[in-house]
Amino acid sequence: MPNDRVFLLEALARFIEQARQVVGVRRIAVVGSLTTPKPDLKDADVLVTVGEDVDLGVLAKLGRKLKGAAQIRNLGADVFFANTDGHYIGRTCGFRECHPRVRCSGISCQPGNWLCDDFHVIRLEDELVAAPPIEVWPQIVVRVDLPLDIREVLLMQSQRAPSIMARPIIW
């Protein structure tokens, strides 16, 4: 049985493989504790940059699958969104359907929106959106010291993407 890091990375790799095929997805990056060698993680965080032509419903469904996979191990996952102007716009809504009276932390919750704009809970800084630690699609860009398991699990599956190493990497 893989440890929690590898388990999350494998689930994230499945998400990335499917999300990169969604029309309107411009970039996929890994952020958060998975980009560090921290052994005990609680979640996987991914940042997806989207154009106006994206179907957030498809990405929300993929995000719920990622969260469901993580919950098997009492872990979590967040799929964050940024627009092509480089601004954080929210994260996937955790609910499949929008219901009044359901506890939702979004500011402008609307059926079919699939975007949770709970900026009072979390907001990604523009600097993180502009230069996330690890971009995995459409090209690989690494800006941090790369944990070995990221290289083995995520980057090996993304080999089709061109690589840019912003920092020297010690294999």
Predicted regions and their residues:
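Catalytic core of pol beta-like nucleotidyltransferases
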Residues: 1-27, 35-41, 50-171
